[in-house]
Curated annotation (Swiss-Prot):
This is Ribosome maturation factor RimM. Transmembrane segments: none annotated. GO terms for molecular function: ribosome binding. Keywords: Chaperone, Cytoplasm, Ribosome biogenesis, rRNA processing. It is found in: Cytoplasm. The lineage of its organism: Bacteria, Pseudomonadati, Thermodesulfobacteriota, Syntrophobacteria, Syntrophobacterales.
Amino acid sequence: MSKTVEPACLVPVGKVTRTHGIRGALKIFPYGESLAAQAAGERFFLRSKNGGYCTLTLIGLRAQGRMLVCGFEEIKDVNGAQPFVGEEIFLPEDRLPPVSEGEYYHYRLIGLDIVTLDGESLGVLRKIIETGGNDVYVAEREGREILIPAIEDVIREIDLERKRMVVDLPEGLVDA
């Protein structure tokens, strides 16, 4: 496995949950659909326990329920796979599939300031919960979490340049 320096913008696309089989495949929980859309030959970056990154070449993947089982050219057996359990797998930003207008990769939204139509700050978007029906944005303000449904009636504007999201919350969603 070749050690590399971190490219300018690596985006996490999944997390290694365990090894799979004696040939060193990795069982990965994907963050969205970016990982599953990749083809054999694609190069990924995995963070190793020592903090560095290894470049790995995908030789194949298959779905197993919600998980993906991925084989990499550089990992030959379970002993070679074990150090990556619990680590995230990354792609360079320019290798991600494009998104439609009005859609955003989660990593682009994390860190946005969330404000109401009246300009009241609700905090910073810290994480996104995928619920199946619609995502839920988790804003953090003064140690409290505010859950915001990611639906068109609530999310009024996303401005990535200004790092801001404007929301119109239903009455009673946030206690005073």
